[in-house]
């Protein structure tokens, strides 16, 4: 007998016990839930309830907040643009608009704010519409080639 043959003859999945089908089946009447109480009711799982103990979300302090006015940018690397140009998915590299980026799935919507980052390298001359650019990408894009 080998370790990998220990469970070879056993069924892969045990059939679940059928509940609430009479007293003779062993799990009839209350179906293993006992009598009354919170856990006997349907939809019983109370999120965050720890049996009367102070829940974790009230024990821990509140931390920070999300500013409604903060600009949230979708990130596009110049390496990804170059890959799409090489694969001929971007035909006119001199005019890469937000609409085209959304169409190619780089950003979720043409209304999204776009930030260009410098990961990768550009071989083709490009014209990109964007809202922000990193220093590294700025150096690569504003070269004589880029």
Swiss-Prot record:
What's the protein here called? Large ribosomal subunit protein uL15
> Which keywords appear in this protein's UniProt record, sorted alphabetically?
Ribonucleoprotein, Ribosomal protein, RNA-binding, rRNA-binding
List the record's Gene Ontology CC terms alphabetically: large ribosomal subunit
Q: Lineage of the source organism?
A: Bacteria, Pseudomonadati, Pseudomonadota, Alphaproteobacteria, Rickettsiales
Answer yes or no on keyword GTP-binding.
no
Q: What superkingdom heads the lineage?
A: Bacteria
Assembly mode? Part of the 50S ribosomal subunit.
Q: What Pfam families does the annotation carry?
A: Ribosomal_L27A (PF00828)
Q: Which GO terms describe its biological process?
A: translation
User: Which terms in the Gene Ontology molecular function aspect does this entry carry?
Assistant: rRNA binding; structural constituent of ribosome
Q: What does this protein do?
A: Binds to the 23S rRNA.
Q: Which portions of the sequence form the region Disordered? A: 18-45
Q: Which HAMAP family does the UniProt record give?
A: Ribosomal_uL15
Would the keyword Secreted be found if you checked this record's keyword annotation? no
Q: Which ranges are annotated Basic residues under compositional bias?
A: 30-39
Name the family the entry cites: Belongs to the universal ribosomal protein uL15 family.
Q: Which residues form a coiled coil?
A: none
Q: Which organism is it from?
A: Anaplasma marginale (strain St. Maries)
